[in-house]
Amino acid sequence: MRFDEAYSGKVFIMSRSNYEKSKAVIFGMPMDWTVSFRPSSRFGPNRIREASLGLEEYSPYMDKHLEEVAYFDAGDMLLPFGNPQRSLEMIESYVDKLLADQKMPIGLGGEHLVSWPIFKAMHKIYPDMAIIHIDAHADLREEYEGEPLSHSTPIRKACSLIGPENVYSFGIRSGMREEFQYAKDSGMYMAKFEVATPLKEVLPKLAGRNVYVTIDIDVLDPAFAPGTGTAEAGGISSKELLEAIVAIAHSDVNVIGADLVEVAPAYDPSEKTPIAASKFVREMLLGWV
């Protein structure tokens, strides 16, 4: 006899045991091979799962219970340590399979570069997609110290893939001058410093569209999420990010997938970062799936 795995801390709380009957699939991407400052986000997915044990299954934000959403936690991918290219290929292939099985991908990072292969996989099925990007950093570099495969490049790659006019960034407060100039010149949407208010203004314009949402935990002020590789002072509160997640849930956009990245537990002995992240994942499941 085995005790209920859904309450073991090895999977996200209340994860179903049946992949076939699930609508969404949670999967971890434990990669921090290109991190330029502080590594450890490869340990993020499992710490988020463990922190989920402290959650209530009911959300007063969504007025829903996790028993109402069929999701399966596939665990962490076995990515080759130190090999970004092969790791990204594996992530893209896995998301291809999820989409072929008509599952909604919910990815846990890991550094933000892991979002890039997901964008590519999603674009094959949803060529008209838009991306909502919530982050402290612009991530619009073409390369970092000569390396195009970097955690500082995924949104620039997304602009090349789907067109900058289909990329909407919120909460941005850090980047090179050239990144901010690119955003201004290219036609992409960038809201600096804030998330909830500008997002609510943009969502009606995205009504009816297929939207992928990528959230970097460092959009939060370090007071709320110190456990991240590149913390940036001057961020938003946990309350504002919850408000943004709820706003997306109550909008007319069609969320086709999502990820939450850059939880680096080594820098947060209090565990407030994975605790917050687990709550965000709960709201994403209840509001977007």
Curated annotation (Swiss-Prot):
Its EC number is 3.5.3.11. InterPro entries: Agmatinase-rel, Ureohydrolase, Ureohydrolase_dom_sf, Ureohydrolase_Mn_BS. Its cofactor is Mn(2+). Mn(2+) binds at residues 112, 135, 137, 139, 216, 218. It comes from the Bacteria. Pathway: Amine and polyamine biosynthesis; putrescine biosynthesis via agmatine pathway; putrescine from agmatine: step 1/1. GO terms for biological process: putrescine biosynthetic process from arginine, via agmatine; spermidine biosynthetic process. The keyword Manganese applies. It catalyses: agmatine + H2O = urea + putrescine. CDD domains: Agmatinase-like_2. The keyword Metal-binding applies. GO terms for molecular function: agmatinase activity; metal ion binding. Keywords: Hydrolase, Manganese, Metal-binding, Polyamine biosynthesis, Putrescine biosynthesis, Spermidine biosynthesis. Belongs to the arginase family. Agmatinase subfamily. This is Agmatinase. It comes from Halalkalibacterium halodurans (strain ATCC BAA-125 / DSM 18197 / FERM 7344 / JCM 9153 / C-125).
